[in-house]
Amino acid sequence: MKVQMIERIFLIQLCLLTVVLASSRAVVEFESTGTKLVNSLRVLAAYSQSSVCVDEKISGIERQIEEVKDMYGNHSFILKGLNGILNNKVNMLTREIQMETVGNNTFETETGKLTKGLNRAVNISPFKYIKKFKTVSTKKFESLLNKYDLVAKKGGELTEEQKKKKEVLSRISRVVAATTIEAGLAQGVVDLCITVTTSLCLVSASIGGVGFLIWLTIIYQALT
């Protein structure tokens, strides 16, 4: 019994360490992408004929990138998602530069899009969307469970198959309701992934993930 307890404690510590390391890597990757993005903007600025202060605009983008990093630095899942979107933007700008399709107004257009997208990342909370989908899913599970309970209240008896379905639904419902997905997605399900089956853990993470993807789409639309 003591051996099992020690093993479980060790496993939990290992998982938490993995989360911390993943968070650190996510920050480093995000910083690297931010640097590439700023460098691309400086190249675009060379083509610009606008009288607007280039350095001021680029400094504004740098401040926004730093603000996003500080805000989501402890949420590697979120930072990785944003990093993917910004990295896509870097690749797009790189192609434009290589193909020499940069126009006189490209710098102003792209800095405007980036300002808008990063502003959304800061001012629109991803947790709002994650929590909304979690709440909707929890209510759906409760509704399904109530149907089985209604059969019992009417004096009926569930079949073996129905009993199994109810048990699975009940377990998933508990995981979804208890998991603090809105507090950090991957980080929030660490302990539950240790104590319940992997499939249930993935279900709970996926439910929050739907809301997260919608949030990323809102930012992506601003950047494009």
From Swiss-Prot:
Q: What is its main location?
A: membrane
GO-annotated biological processes: ascospore wall assembly
Carbohydrate attachment residues: N74, N104
Give residue ranges on the Extracellular side: 27-174, 221-224
On induction, the UniProt comment says: In respiratory-deficient cells and by heat.
The record lists the membrane-crossing segments as 175-195, 200-220
Tell me if Cell wall biogenesis/degradation is a UniProt keyword of this record.
no
Bilayer topology term: Multi-pass membrane protein
Give compartment(s).
Answer: Membrane
Give the knockout phenotype. Answer: Displays increased levels of spontaneous RAD52 foci in proliferating diploid cells. A combined deletion of the LOH1/OSW4 and IRC18/OSW6 has reduced dityrosine incorporation in the outer spore wall.
A GO term from the CC aspect: membrane
Superkingdom field: Eukaryota
Please describe what this protein does. Answer: Involved in spore wall assembly.
Family designation: Belongs to the OSW4/6 family.
Q: What is this protein called?
A: Outer spore wall protein 6
Q: Which organism is it from?
A: Saccharomyces cerevisiae (strain ATCC 204508 / S288c)
The record's gene field reads IRC18
